[in-house]
């Protein structure tokens, strides 16, 4: 069973977690020219 030999300090854990970045999806232009988020329904045209 995998058990750590030593406790990981708060600083060390925080340094490791700095690489877990969240990237936001970029908005795309719809057929009517409005910007929307991808994979969302446009309320005016009803397109996905």
From Swiss-Prot:
PANTHER family: 50S RIBOSOMAL PROTEIN L32, LARGE RIBOSOMAL SUBUNIT PROTEIN BL32. Pfam families: Ribosomal_L32p. Belongs to the bacterial ribosomal protein bL32 family. The keyword Ribosomal protein applies. The keyword Protease does not apply. GO terms for cellular component: large ribosomal subunit. This is Large ribosomal subunit protein bL32. Keywords: Ribonucleoprotein, Ribosomal protein. Residues 26-48 are annotated as: Disordered. GO terms for molecular function: structural constituent of ribosome. It comes from Campylobacter fetus subsp. fetus (strain 82-40). It comes from the Bacteria. One of its GO terms (biological process) is translation. NCBIfam families: rpmF_bact.
């Amino acid at each position: 069973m995998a058990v750590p030999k030593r406790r990981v300090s708060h600083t060390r854990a925080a340094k490791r977690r700095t690489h877990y970045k969240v990237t936001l999806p970029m908005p795309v232009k719809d057929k009517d020219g409005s910007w929307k988020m991808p994979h969302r329904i446009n309320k005016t045209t009803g397109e996905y």
